[in-house]
């Protein structure tokens, strides 16, 4: 066989023209130590803070410590298959979780993976768990109410859409119950809810899911769960994942509510991670950036304007503002609200609801201390009817508390003092409310009208609960159309006063 040089040269030219010399740059590192879920990696010179690191066997880690030559990362999941000398790779991506309407009614872990055996999630998109909070120009003032369904909160410590209201108290004082009742109260509204459970028993989470399902509120709620048996990194990430899911609705011109139950557990998990990473400990062994841990999370809760929503959706949604309201919960020890994490959260949030053990044990539920509970948004987050009817409630309770402590040392009291004490007792009784029974705006307005116009003076304190139940049944039975109008209008004028007076005057209590 004879080879021609011209054919050989043509073949070589053809092969050269078709040769593809594309290559992919990949940042590579080597594991040099493993301990308690923390890996130290040599290399990865171009890695970002909080970047995902690809490990062998489809495992990932998050880069938290960026030193000169070493990267400290925390493994998400089991780390027993890892060993020193293994190669790892940077991904160039921050951790992302699924978002969208299809998450409603589902129970997820901190990574957005389903835990409820209902199959895979058909998500709209993935979003990074760490995002920059909206700027000052993008925000609106908080002037729309978010009804909790609790008489004591809606009248004295009102919460507005986009607000951050801290719920603080010792264990077993009704913090979670208050937040869950608030979620239940949103079932007939367009407010989407996210409940983030951090460091609780899985059985407790199951009970919460069952209660929401029982009250038809689960279909409007996303449950994000990092239980006590989960790793510290999942407990640390869960609030950020839940916040990202809530931002999906906020940025598209909808209203959403998120509950963090509770952030003291997240702080403990972050302290554990930081100590394992050999970060220098500060007060109560927490790292120096513990304040930033919570501030960057809670600042993402806001009410954003129409321009922000329009720009975010690229013109698909117009003339709509969105909001993300946060109810962070923090647990205190022995009523000490001056400890490190509670004081941090008090300074970050727009108000706080203090729940006290002695009030809870004496039968006052919710066990709110009105003297030190406050909403920094104030009356601007209340409906007109509730604002005008509840104006003197806090003052009356303050006078009652002052007089009741004075009355312990005096046997003879004048008639006016006795009347004030009796009036205060009846206000406390009327503000009591059972769990899982949020109250509509019209019912709250009717009861506050009864308090303001001294209708309760005719009955004994022990009969207030019975009086309340009978009055509400009477209003529902004979004036249901009008009660429904109050729920929609929020206005308090002469016509409303006349109608409320008619309901009260037509009611006979036996």
Curated annotation (Swiss-Prot):
Subcellular location: Cell membrane
Pfam family of the protein (one): ATP-synt_ab_C
Keywords of this entry: ATP synthesis, ATP-binding, Cell membrane, CF(1), Hydrogen ion transport, Ion transport, Membrane, Nucleotide-binding, Translocase, Transport
Topology term for the membrane: Peripheral membrane protein
Signal peptide location: none
Annotated GO MF terms: ADP binding; ATP binding; proton-transporting ATP synthase activity, rotational mechanism
Marked site: Required for activity: 373
Family annotation (InterPro entries): ATP_synth_asu-like_sf, ATP_synth_asu_C, ATP_synth_asu_C_sf, ATP_synth_F1_a_nt-bd_dom, ATP_synth_F1_asu, ATPase_a/bsu_AS, ATPase_F1/V1/A1_a/bsu_N, ATPase_F1/V1/A1_a/bsu_N_sf
Main location (coarse class): membrane
GO cellular component: plasma membrane; proton-transporting ATP synthase complex
Enzyme Commission designation: 7.1.2.2
Catalytic class of the enzyme: translocase
UniProt binding sites for ATP: 169-176
Catalytic activity: ATP + H2O + 4 H(+)(in) = ADP + phosphate + 5 H(+)(out)
UniProt record similarity statement: Belongs to the ATPase alpha/beta chains family.
Oligomeric and partner information: F-type ATPases have 2 components, CF(1) - the catalytic core - and CF(0) - the membrane proton channel. CF(1) has five subunits: alpha(3), beta(3), gamma(1), delta(1), epsilon(1). CF(0) has three main subunits: a(1), b(2) and c(9-12). The alpha and beta chains form an alternating ring which encloses part of the gamma chain. CF(1) is attached to CF(0) by a central stalk formed by the gamma and epsilon chains, while a peripheral stalk is formed by the delta and b chains.
General function of this protein: Produces ATP from ADP in the presence of a proton gradient across the membrane. The alpha chain is a regulatory subunit.
Protein known as: ATP synthase subunit alpha
Native source species: Wigglesworthia glossinidia brevipalpis
């Amino acid at each position: 066989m004879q080879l021609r040089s011209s054919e050989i040269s043509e073949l070589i030219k053809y092969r050269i023209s078709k040769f593809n010399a594309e290559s992919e740059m990949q940042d590579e590192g080597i594991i040099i130590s493993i301990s308690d879920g923390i890996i130290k990696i040599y290399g990865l010179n171009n890695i970002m803070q909080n970047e995902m690191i690809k490990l062998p066997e489809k495992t990932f880690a998050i880069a938290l410590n960026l030193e000169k030559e070493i990267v400290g990362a925390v493994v998400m999941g089991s780390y027993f298959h890892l060993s020193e000398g293994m190669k790892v790779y940077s991904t160039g991506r921050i951790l992302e979780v699924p978002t969208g309407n299809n998450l409603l009614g589902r129970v997820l872990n901190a990574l957005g993976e389903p835990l409820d055996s209902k199959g895979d999630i058909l998500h709209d998109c993935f979003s990074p768990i760490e995002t920059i909070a909206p700027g000052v120009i993008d925000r609106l003032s908080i002037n729309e109410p978010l009804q909790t369904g609790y008489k004591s909160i809606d009248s004295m410590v009102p919460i507005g859409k986009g607000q951050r209201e801290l719920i603080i108290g010792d264990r077993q004082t009704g913090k979670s119950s208050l937040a869950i009742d608030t979620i239940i109260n949103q079932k007939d509204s367009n407010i989407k809810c996210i409940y983030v459970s951090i460091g609780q028993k899985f059985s407790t989470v199951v009970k919460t899911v069952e209660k929401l399902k029982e009250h038809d509120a689960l279909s409007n709620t996303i449950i994000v769960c990092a239980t006590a048996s989960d790793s510290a990194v999942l407990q640390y990430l869960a609030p950020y994942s839940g916040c990202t899911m809530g931002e999906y609705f906020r940025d598209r011109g909808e209203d959403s509510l998120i509950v963090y139950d509770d952030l003291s557990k997240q702080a403990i998990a972050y302290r554990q991670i930081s100590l394992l990473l050999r970060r220098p400990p500060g007060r109560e062994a927490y790292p120096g950036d513990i304040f930033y841990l919570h501030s960057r999370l809670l600042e993402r809760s806001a009410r954003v304007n129409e321009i922000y929503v329009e720009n975010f959706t690229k013109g698909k949604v117009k003339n709509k503002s969105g909001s993300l309201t946060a109810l962070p919960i923090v647990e205190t020890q022995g009523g000490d609200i001056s400890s490190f994490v509670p004081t941090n959260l008090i300074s970050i949030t727009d108000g706080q609801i203090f729940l006290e053990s002695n009030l809870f044990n004496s039968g006052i539920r919710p066990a709110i201390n009105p003297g030190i509970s406050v909403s920094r948004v104030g009356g601007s987050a209340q409906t007109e009817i509730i604002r005008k009817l509840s104006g003197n409630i806090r003052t009356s309770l303050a006078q009652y508390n002052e007089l009741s402590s004075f009355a312990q040392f005096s046997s003879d009291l004048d008639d006016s003092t006795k009347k004030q004490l009796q009036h205060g007792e009846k206000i406390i009784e009327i503000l009591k409310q059972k769990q899982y029974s949020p109250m509509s705006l019209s019912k709250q307005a009717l009861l506050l009208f009864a308090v303001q116009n001294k209708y309760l003076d005719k009955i004994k304190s022990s009969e207030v609960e019975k009086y309340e139940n009978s009055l509400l049944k009477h209003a529902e039975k004979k004036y249901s159309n009008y009660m429904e109008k109050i729920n929609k209008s929020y206005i308090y004028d002469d016509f409303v006063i006349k109608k409320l007076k008619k309901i009260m005057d037509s009611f006979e209590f036996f």
